[in-house]
Amino acid sequence: NKIKITATSTGKVPNTSATAASSGSDLNGMAAKNAAEKIKSRMAEYLAAEAQIKPNEVSFEDGKVLVGANDYNFSDAVKRCYMGRISLSATGFYSTPKVHWNPKTLKGRPFYYFAYGAACSEVVVDLLTGENRILRTDILHDVGKSLNPAIDIGQIEGGYVQGAGWLTTEELVWDDRGRLLTHAPSTYKIPACSDRPLDFRVKLFSEGENCEETIHRSKAVGEPPLMLGTSVLMALSHALQAVNARKAYPNLNACLLYTSPSP
């Protein structure tokens, strides 16, 4: 109740970035932490000087500030600093460390960390019409120490369904002049709610913990689940293989580029 987050605005925060992709907690969260640590340091220095102790003897715990023998509510400690003319605002900044890449040698570290996931999908296919359904999907995903399990599970479900649609119903079609015809959801098929697995089971890896420094050792999971949609493509291929006594896997040509609409 004591923390309020406003809409992103360069009128309030210069050079701000949007909350998109997998940047919410990793970038914006760490920048907010950086700003909070600056204010915390100022408060500790002022309160320590007031009590004639060292700043490292000031601790912030459970809504309280312990200053030597004194025990203040956080709001009271803030008021003391305010009356002492201590700045209680700060700008935080964070850029992902350890990331580097050489496009010439194709070597480096393009990612700060990895979020791992596994999916198993069961499908049914009408061999006469090609109509198919996802009967069941089981997913286990690593999210580090989850900040909000409900949000993480929702991200995983959405990313998976998007990936399944990318590999089964979306199609890139150009005309003879090279213009993209399927340029928006109005011109290509995206998954609907009815296309999600009839039995959808998602679990978070309970023993996960980010080895890199992030907010509470969490991991972003906005984009990684997209690739789990490949389990649907492989399941469809496996189902079609049954027609040929499992002698060979058929090539489904997922994500190929076409110059004219399919018949």
Q: Residue locations for each model-derived region?
A:
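C-terminal catalytic domains of large/alpha subunits in multi-subunit enzymes
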Residues: N1-S260
